[in-house]
């Protein structure tokens, strides 16, 4: 019983760590989403056919800076040195005391190239409209990634509750023996 209790305790710690990782990933994804919303505003502004070439260029420069910020966020969203949202994060968390009690997680890439927003052109009304569509697609893609992280967090919370109950029950039995 003592070994089981210790195993459950370590599993709870693993689950807590996994939840922390998912929180960091979700925060990174959300920061990218905030920029996507700003990009959508800028592209909508640039699609106004009454803008001058200089105005479009200024908006284009802002867009370029925002896209660079997306890539910076992706590069900087890390946990214990591991990049989380650049498409390379694929780990298996030990979520229980048994050999098969694990959860495999692979997080999506949210850099500008993966979201197809790395080459937005706002130089004309028509191109700005195309950019709006690309940004809408990126928002949809990223929304799915955020939802997947939310689902993982929900599974981890359920597992954490089950482990806590099992640990409490194990300790109760152990104390009566």
What name fits each language-model region?
Residues 1-177:
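Primary detection of the long, small/polar-rich alpha-helical "axial" segments characteristic
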């Amino acid at each position: 019983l003592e070994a089981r209790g210790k195993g459950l305790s370590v599993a709870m710690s693993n689950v807590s760590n996994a939840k922390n990782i998912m929180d960091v990933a979700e925060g990174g994804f959300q920061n990218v989403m905030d920029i996507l919303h700003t990009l959508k505003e800028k592209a909508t502004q640039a699609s106004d056919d009454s803008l001058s070439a200089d105005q479009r260029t200024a908006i284009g420069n802002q867009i370029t800076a925002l896209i660079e910020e997306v890539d910076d966020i992706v590069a900087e969203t890390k946990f214990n040195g591991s990049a989380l949202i650049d498409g390379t994060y694929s780990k298996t968390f030990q979520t229980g005391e048994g050999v098969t009690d694990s959860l495999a997680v692979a997080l999506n890439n949210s850099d500008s190239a993966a979201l197809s927003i790395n080459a937005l052109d706002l130089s004309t009304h028509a191109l700005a409209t195309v950019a709006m569509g690309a940004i809408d697609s990126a928002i949809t893609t990223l929304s799915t990634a955020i939802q997947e992280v939310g689902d993982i967090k929900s599974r981890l919370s359920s597992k954490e509750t089950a482990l806590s109950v099992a640990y409490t029950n194990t300790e109760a039995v152990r104390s009566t023996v």
